[in-house]
């Protein structure tokens, strides 16, 4: 009987990708199969995130909840960014943990588990061995028509509030050919949509075929678009400073590049942006969006916002709200500033009451939610191209898929539509989703009847 591994993932899409790779590595090396039931697992892994406040305490709290499972011989591992930050401290506080590993050493999981058995003591490896992990990962196993592909690791921007360079290392790009081989392999398995991942994906500079030449992100997009079977290309996360004219022009050259962009701005006040060490002004950010929308007028924008950064005044907050009004964001991920240990911003004087920060966050989210509602309602009556992902979470008898602009659409349809591209007429706008009716279906798949 195959051993079972349960993986709990916290945080970003990079972590989702890494969690899938953990399962692939363990399956190839030791025959582990994934399970969604922690009670039947032989191995439990937490893939952690340290971006938000109290992330470490959350991990130790969750570890405490599964400690009782050690009685039947379950192995426990902690990976991800909290593992990188805490290292041996995790073993000191939770000595029942068997292995601790960082984002760059997940490929060593089978080896670490074997050493845990042989040496009868916990193993810790949170080193940064460049891009080595990608050389040791088995071919991806995918289910469905959409997949993530990591093209680079780390970040070299060192924004004053951000812990990523310290937990994932500086920017290292995967070789150009390696990325294309992975995407082509996914296309052979029926994947139609790929999301290219990196902490700063548009800073990509991949070596080409063992030569001294390097490919930038715009060139990588062109080659990915040429791979047979790939119909949609997404990417996240990008940095405004690396949004070059070549990358902007790619939106004119590459129809497969979706009209949806997540481009974190973080704030709308130049004073706060400077304190954050973001390296651009609000006007420069808006200029990039204007250029993009000159090419793609229907480009949907989402972003990240930090409210209550140390020293933020009502005037600063007002400038952020004006930027939101100017851009008309389609969605956002917005948070109250939380100091991360070891970052420059953690030592900044912060005298803004929490109640004020909370009020500002609520105001910001109210405006974004109004934008979401308005944009969703404007889609009613239009025909949207949908990639069908599977059963609807609202109603298992229906299907769900995503528009090019990343809106979830629920609709009645035959299960054979899963994995296909279909045209759907939008009939109703819900709070965060749309409803629709199938118009056509590719490849002879059947609409509901």
Curated annotation (Swiss-Prot):
Gene3D superfamilies: Methylthiotransferase, N-terminal domain (3.40.50.12160), tm_1862 like domain (3.80.30.20). Residues 141-376 form the Radical SAM core domain. Keywords: 4Fe-4S, Cytoplasm, Iron, Iron-sulfur, Metal-binding, S-adenosyl-L-methionine, Transferase, tRNA processing. PROSITE patterns: MTTASE_N, MTTASE_RADICAL, RADICAL_SAM, TRAM. Transmembrane segments: none annotated. It is an enzyme of class 2 (transferase). InterPro entries: Elp3/MiaA/NifB-like_rSAM, Methylthiotransferase, Methylthiotransferase_CS, Methylthiotransferase_N, Methylthiotransferase_N_sf, MiaB_methiolase, rSAM, rSAM_horseshoe. GO terms for molecular function: 4 iron, 4 sulfur cluster binding; metal ion binding; N6-isopentenyladenosine methylthiotransferase activity. The keyword Cell division does not apply. Residues 377-440 form the TRAM domain. It comes from the Bacteria. Pfam families: Radical_SAM (PF04055), TRAM (PF01938), UPF0004 (PF00919). It catalyses: N(6)-dimethylallyladenosine(37) in tRNA + (sulfur carrier)-SH + AH2 + 2 S-adenosyl-L-methionine = 2-methylsulfanyl-N(6)-dimethylallyladenosine(37) in tRNA + (sulfur carrier)-H + 5'-deoxyadenosine + L-methionine + A + S-adenosyl-L-homocysteine + 2 H(+). [4Fe-4S] cluster 1 binds at residues 12, 49, 81. Its cofactor is [4Fe-4S] cluster. Its EC number is 2.8.4.3. [4Fe-4S] cluster 2 binds at residues 155, 159, 162. Binds 2 [4Fe-4S] clusters. One cluster is coordinated with 3 cysteines and an exchangeable S-adenosyl-L-methionine. Residues 3-118 form the MTTase N-terminal domain. Catalyzes the methylthiolation of N6-(dimethylallyl)adenosine (i(6)A), leading to the formation of 2-methylthio-N6-(dimethylallyl)adenosine (ms(2)i(6)A) at position 37 in tRNAs that read codons beginning with uridine. NCBIfam families: miaB-methiolase (TIGR01574), MiaB/RimO family radical SAM methylthiotransferase (TIGR00089). Belongs to the methylthiotransferase family. MiaB subfamily. This is tRNA-2-methylthio-N(6)-dimethylallyladenosine synthase. The gene is miaB.
């Amino acid at each position: 009987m195959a051993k079972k591994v349960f993986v709990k993932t916290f945080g970003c899409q990079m972590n989702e990708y890494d969690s899938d790779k953990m399962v692939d590595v363990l399956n190839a090396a030791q025959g582990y199969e994934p399970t969604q039931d922690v009670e039947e697992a032989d191995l439990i892994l937490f893939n952690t995130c340290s971006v938000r406040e109290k992330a470490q305490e959350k991990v130790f709290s969750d570890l405490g909840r599964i400690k009782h499972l050690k009685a039947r011989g379950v192995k426990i591992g902690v990976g991800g960014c909290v593992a990188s930050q805490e290292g041996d401290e995790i073993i000191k506080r939770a000595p029942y943990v068997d292995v601790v590993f960082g984002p760059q050493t997940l490929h060593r999981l089978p080896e670490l588990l074997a050493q845990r058995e042989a040496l009868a003591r916990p193993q810790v490896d949170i080193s940064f061995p460049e891009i080595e992990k990608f050389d040791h990962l088995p071919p991806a196993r995918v289910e469905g028509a959409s997949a993530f592909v990591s093209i680079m690791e780390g970040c070299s921007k060192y924004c004053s509030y951000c812990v990523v360079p310290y937990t994932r290392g500086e920017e290292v790009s995967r070789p150009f050919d390696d990325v294309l081989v992975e995407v082509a392999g996914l296309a052979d398995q029926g994947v139609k949509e790929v999301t290219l991942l990196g902490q700063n994906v548009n800073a990509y500079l991949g070596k080409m075929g063992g030569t001294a030449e390097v490919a930038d992100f715009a060139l990588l997009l062109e080659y990915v678009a040429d791979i047979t079977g790939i119909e949609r290309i997404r990417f996240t996360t990008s940095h405004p400073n690396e949004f070059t004219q070549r990358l902007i022009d790619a939106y004119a050259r590459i129809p497969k590049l979706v009209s949806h962009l997540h481009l974190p701005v973080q704030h709308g006040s130049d004073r706060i942006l400077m304190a954050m060490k973001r390296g651009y002004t609000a006007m420069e950010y808006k200029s990039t969006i204007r250029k993009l929308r000159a090419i793609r007028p229907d480009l949907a924008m989402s972003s990240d916002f930090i409210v209550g950064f140390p020293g933020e005044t009502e005037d600063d907050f007002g400038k952020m709200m004006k930027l939101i009004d100017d851009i008309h964001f389609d969605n956002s991920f917005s948070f109250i500033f939380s100091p991360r240990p070891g970052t420059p911003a953690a030592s900044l004087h912060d005298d803004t009451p929490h109640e004020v920060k909370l009020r500002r966050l609520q105001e910001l989210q109210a405006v974004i939610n109004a934008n979401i509602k308005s944009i969703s309602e404007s889609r009613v009556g239009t025909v949207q191209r949908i990639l069908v992902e599977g059963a609807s979470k609202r109603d298992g008898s229906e299907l769900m898929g995503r528009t090019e602009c990343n809106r979830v659409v629920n609709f009645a349809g035959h299960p054979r539509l899963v994995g296909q591209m279909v045209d759907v007429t939008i009939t109703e706008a819900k709070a965060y989703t749309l409803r629709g009716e199938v118009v056509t279906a590719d490849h002879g798949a059947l609409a509901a009847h």
